[in-house]
Amino acid sequence: QEKEKGSSHMTKADTCARYCADMAWSLVTIPAGSKAPRAMGWQRPEQAISTADAAREYWTANPDHNVGLLHSASGTVALDIDNVEWTRIIFEGLGLDYDALMASAPRIVGRADRGKVLFRAPRNLDLSRRAISWPNPETGKSEVVLEFRAGAVQDVLPPSIHPDTGNPYTWAGRSVWDGLPDLPAPILTIWREWDRFRPQMMDLCPWKPAPEFKPARKPRPPSDRASAIEGFNAAHDIHATLERYGYNRCGRSDRYLSPN
């Protein structure tokens, strides 16, 4: 596993302080053994830890707690790969180079069969979380393939401990301390035009059930009753008919008073 140069000797408190000082990131606190924040209102930027002193103080006092990156307050976004094999199918279908994208940015590794790459968020664009799910061919249950993560969401950062493996999250790919690259234009296009690209990504699923053929419904022929009513209305003036049956017209208006 690739390791971040110069970070192996740092304590968690030192690393978190450096995230704030060097990267200008806003961090959220996560209890030990978890990937989810529990503090009330953790999604609000004002609740996040954003200074080196505050980060060092908190994680010195709570060294076993995990740490998360709050995207909305940090100017960051992430592409989260939950299924590498299926994501490769999508990328190939869209003409994208999966390996080149993974190598172009810092990558968080929690488990060997997954990946998460971080990018700088585009300015003046309000991106939100999006996800593609495919049915598992063995279970039939829907499973997330990949997520586009932005806004009031967080991602666990190294050196937090993964609750399932018991091992620390690590950095791979491009060095995080060199800064984050801009979100690649093709990924941004997919994100911004989600309603156009989502159906394409869903259709790329090799085992997607074929749509059930439903023959077009034949138009119903007009009924005899409808034809009789239309014929009567065409042959008779409505005003003359009402007056014949005793209705009294109100002046020159189209209103009539009942004879009863």
Language-model region placement:
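Conserved phosphate/metal-binding and DNA-contacting active-site motifs used
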Residues: Q1-A226, Y247-S253
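Amphipathic alpha-helical segments
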Residues: G93-G95, N233-Y245
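ATP-binding catalytic core of ATPases
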Residues: R225, F232-N233
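Short cysteine-rich clusters marking metal-coordination/redox-active sites
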Residues: S258-N260
